[in-house]
Amino acid sequence: MKKTIVALAVAAVAATSANAATVYNQDGTKVDVNGSVRLILKKEKNERGDLVDNGSRVSFKASHDLGEGLSALAYAELRFSKNEKVEVKDAQNQQVVRKYEVERIGNDVHVKRLYAGFAYEGLGTLTFGNQLTIGDDVGVSDYTYFLGGINNLLSSGEKAINFKSAEFNGFTFGGAYVFSADADKQAPRDGRGFVVAGLYNRKMGDVGFALEAGYSQKYVTAAAKQEKEKAFMVGTELSYAGLALGVDYAQSKVTNVEGKKRALEVGLNYDINDKAKVYTDLIWAKEGPKGATTRDRSIILGAGYKLHKQVETFVEGGWGREKDANGVTTKDNKVGVGLRVHF
């Protein structure tokens, strides 16, 4: 490559395109830069109002044309904020009396995703590294900005190998294997596992239909032992013009641990026009063995509006109720106003 890294960085900063900026494109090599700043002003039950980072990022994508439909690719994504864990200790005996997390903004620039691999035209993409897996693609009912979602699959991995096929008449499939963080044979195998998924999306005129399903297994620590968590998720969506109805069901079970986790999410979204939308999500969930089950019920309402094709604003509220095995109900109410500026 004739350009230096410094030159690429300068070009990326200087780029003013509203879409992903191509900062280098020569001799079959292409480098794109894009990102977004995502902020939410929120209020939760029993907490003061707060302003938080909701995943602001800058990403760099490079591809090299190797000929015959084959290309090599690389991707890096930077994030800017991390929560800080705080412990409050008793002044006399120095014992921890309370733990909580502080949501910071711009306190920690770090690499969130980093992977490379190959893409073959008409076949698919195979990538290696810190990335989302195809399990993250499963789910159709979450139309929210930050409160919804019930995906229980192995959806990402720091050390992952992921394959995703090209689209064949609306059908896409794939799988991923995730290594544990530590290769030492004596170390815990937490997070190691695999996921497979199939996605079908088809549109005929104003009518759209989607059917998605996935299955995963991964190691977790339960009762001081390494056990396998088996999970599956299935969802379907039907849409007509600007109206869409989606339903997802997720279930997971840890080997040798009583009880299962089950969740059902129903979402309804209406695009008023190409700028405005309104939506609602309902979530039912339960967890634990028979006789000691915890049940959750949530309703989410929201609206989004695009001031520009690259500028999103939204307001979203959620009202949750959790009932434990003793019948005690705990309320969990949240509301947020958000802004996302893409570049």
Curated annotation (Swiss-Prot):
Its main location: membrane. Keywords: Cell outer membrane, Disulfide bond, Ion transport, Membrane, Porin, Signal, Transmembrane, Transmembrane beta strand, Transport. It is a multi-pass membrane protein. GO terms for biological process: monoatomic ion transport. One of its GO terms (cellular component) is cell outer membrane. Residues 1-20 form the signal peptide. It is found in: Cell outer membrane. One of its GO terms (molecular function) is porin activity. It holds the Pfam family Porin_4. InterPro entries: Gram-neg_bact_OMP, Gram_neg_porin_domain, Porin_dom_sf, Porin_Neis. Structural rigidity of the outer membrane of elementary bodies and porin forming, permitting diffusion of solutes through the intracellular reticulate body membrane. Disulfide bond interactions within and between MOMP molecules and other components form high molecular-weight oligomers. This is Major outer membrane protein. It comes from Pasteurella multocida. The lineage of its organism: Bacteria, Pseudomonadati, Pseudomonadota, Gammaproteobacteria, Pasteurellales. The gene is ompH.
